[in-house]
Amino acid sequence: MKKFVSVVAAAALVAGMATSCQKHNTLTKAEQAEGWQLLFDGETLNGWRSFNETELKGGWGVVDGCIQASGEGGDASGYIVTDKKYANFELVWDWKLTHGGNSGMLYHVVEHPKFKVPYVTGPEYQLIDNAGWEKVNAPSKLEEWQK
């Protein structure tokens, strides 16, 4: 059976998302009245689980009120999804990246055993440290046949 999940947080192997945040998530009374919902309570990972799993596996935590990836694990194990499904939404979030970090947020992904990673089923909002990326991940010198 296919499960549709609308919001996925993705982390690259060497990137940790947030390193510090100012304050836990809150909604004003007006935002609550308009139907806004928080995906993260600022303290726990309640409401989140690993992609294609029923519970949250390792590699994620809450540090200083922010969801943070440890940067450990392989490509197929670094993704978390919300327990709830969302169809019509506006997604707003704050982020910080480590130097040379590469991470992102995927959305409208499909969970199914035939899909080992969410990025084959949904678009990604890429978060990358452009200034630090080149130094950390410098390309190899082109070989003659590539010129």
Listing of model-derived features with the role each one plays in the protein:
Residues 1-26:
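Bacterial Sec-dependent N-terminal signal peptides
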